[in-house]
Every structure is written in structure tokens, then in C-alpha cells.
């Protein structure tokens, strides 16, 4: 068991998926879940965006562990930030003491690994499932293993992440910060989805309840967040739709959608 007074470094290399934004001014949900894991265990950590790291990098020495999130898989030009590159990820790994555990996660990590990147280092792990759940398992067992979060963990880490350093220490908090909420994961076209898209790979959609989402947003608002985007959805009208498994074209369910749209300031 990792002692609660040890310090981790969380490097937010940003995520940009077809249904999820995380490049500034957005703060992505996956990095918040990772922070939520540490918040739950009262483990000290430092949050750093990759853009801040480029300007004034925090020390990689004397760390209990390092987590690098690299989740930008949608080609694009960004106005306020630049996602972490493979070369930068390599540099972070090579400059970290070999005895320090490093966890790298996100869809970019999966893509780089698929292209043949497979660094050999005893205490380095490339997460191919949920980075947050993989970290949680490591903190419990001191062993690396691919893990998926369950629904209770999803809710807990989302709420804790809303008040984490990914929000309170975010450089854009008192500026244009937009808080990306994961409404659901997956795609209703999980059987015949677009071949170029990663969303069908997540399988049958898994919803979060409107109450769960509203509570998360309330926590974020208390931390100073003013702008929220309802993300993670491949299609707003398929949120909690009827016949997702049985029908090719699910029937929209307007009531839960309406509950979400009562949030004061949102982006869809």
C-alpha cells in the first residue's frame, strides 16, 4: 500500500477525442478522474499542464510516481495549447529516475503503442484501459494491471476530480476555462460505427444519470468554474435513448436531456 504522504506528479498532456475536448481552454475529464483517485486516498500530488511543463518544468526527482496523460487523437490546430508529443513523452520517461513508477495513459498512448512504440523499463506501464482505475489498482497492490472503472468509481472520481488540482491549479481557472463533463461513453453505432472513429471501440453506451452530472457540475462551480461543456457524447439526442441495443436508430428520450439543459451556462 502506498503511504498517503507521498507526492505524485500528474502531467496533463491533454485529450482530444471525437466526443471529448481537453485541450485548453478545456480541462478534460480523464485527467480529473486520475486526480480524483489521489484525492480519494489523500495522497499528495502536483498537477501540471504540458504547456506549463514546457515553460517551467517541475522536478521529476524524488517523486513517488508520475502519471502522463496523452489523449489527443484528433488532428487539429489549437489556439491556446499544444498536446504532448511522443518525443516529449519519451523525454519525460528518460529523465525520470528508473526507480520511479511511471503510468502513461490515454488514446494517444494506445495509438503510439499500436504503431510500435513499446519502451522497455521495469517500472513503466502503458495503460490500455482506464488510466484512473489502473492507477487505483497500483496504489492498492503495488502491481500494474489494465483495469476498467466501475460505475461507483466513475461517480466518485468524477466528483472528487471536480474539486481537484486539475481544476483549482488550472492556469485558465479565472479566465476562459471550460469544464468538460463526460455525460456518457461509447456510441450507439458500436456495431457499425465509423471506421476512422475511436468511439465505437468503447462499446455499448454507458450513461451517467442527470443527477450525478448535476452534482459534479455544482462541485466544479463551487471551485470557481464558470463554463461547462456537456461532452463525451457522440450524439446529444441518443443520451439515455430507448432501444440502443435493439434498434438501428434509437428513439430519443427528451426528459433526461432537458434536465441537463437546465444548467446555467453550458456548451454542447
Where are these regions (language model features)?
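Acidic, low-complexity intrinsically disordered segments
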Residues: 1-212
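Conserved small/polar residues in nucleotide/adenosyl-binding loops
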Residues: 266-268
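Short, Lys/Arg-enriched charge-dense amphipathic segments
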Residues: 68-76, 128-130, 234-236, 249-261
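Flexible glycine/acidic-rich beta-alpha junction loops that bind and position SAM and/or redox cofactors
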Residues: 18, 75-77, 111-113, 229-246
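Conserved alpha-helical substructure of the radical SAM core
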Residues: 200-232, 246-262
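A solvent-exposed, charged loop/short amphipathic helix patch at secondary-structure junctions
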Residues: 78-87, 197-198, 241-258
Amino acid at each position: 500500500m502506498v503511504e498517503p504522504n507521498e507526492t505524485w506528479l500528474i502531467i496533463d498532456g491533454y485529450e482530444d477525442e471525437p466526443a471529448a475536448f481537453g485541450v485548453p481552454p478545456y480541462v478534460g475529464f480523464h485527467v480529473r478522474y486520475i486526480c480524483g483517485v489521489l484525492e480519494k486516498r489523500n495522497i499528495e500530488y502536483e498537477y501540471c499542464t504540458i504547456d506549463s511543463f514546457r515553460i517551467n518544468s517541475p522536478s521529476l526527482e524524488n517523486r513517488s510516481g508520475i502519471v502522463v496523460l496523452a489523449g489527443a487523437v484528433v488532428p487539429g490546430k489549437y489556439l491556446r495549447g499544444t498536446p504532448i508529443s511522443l518525443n516529449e513523452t519519451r523525454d519525460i520517461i528518460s529523465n525520470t529516475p528508473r526507480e520511479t513508477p511511471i503510468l502513461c495513459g490515454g488514446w494517444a498512448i494506445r495509438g503510439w503503442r499500436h504503431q510500435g512504440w513499446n519502451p522497455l523499463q521495469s517500472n513503466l506501464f502503458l495503460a490500455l484501459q482506464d488510466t484512473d482505475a489502473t492507477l487505483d489498482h497500483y496504489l492498492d497492490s503495488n502491481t500494474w494491471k489494465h483495469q476498467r472503472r466501475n460505475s461507483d468509481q466513475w461517480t466518485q472520481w468524477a466528483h472528487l476530480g471536480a474539486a481537484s488540482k486539475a481544476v483549482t491549479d488550472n492556469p485558465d481557472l479565472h479566465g476562459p476555462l471550460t469544464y468538460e463533463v463526460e455525460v456518457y461513453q461509447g456510441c450507439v453505432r458500436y456495431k457499425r460505427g465509423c471506421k476512422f472513429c475511436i468511439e465505437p471501440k468503447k462499446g455499448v453506451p454507458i450513461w451517467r444519470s442527470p443527477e450525478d452530472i448535476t452534482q459534479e457540475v455544482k462541485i466544479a462551480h463551487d471551485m470557481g468554474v464558470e463554463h461547462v461543456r456537456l461532452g463525451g457524447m457522440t450524439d446529444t439526442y441518443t443520451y439515455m435513448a430507448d432501444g440502443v441495443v435493439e434498434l438501428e436508430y434509437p428513439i430519443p428520450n427528451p426528459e433526461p436531456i432537458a434536465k441537463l439543459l437546465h444548467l446555467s451556462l453550458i456548451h454542447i
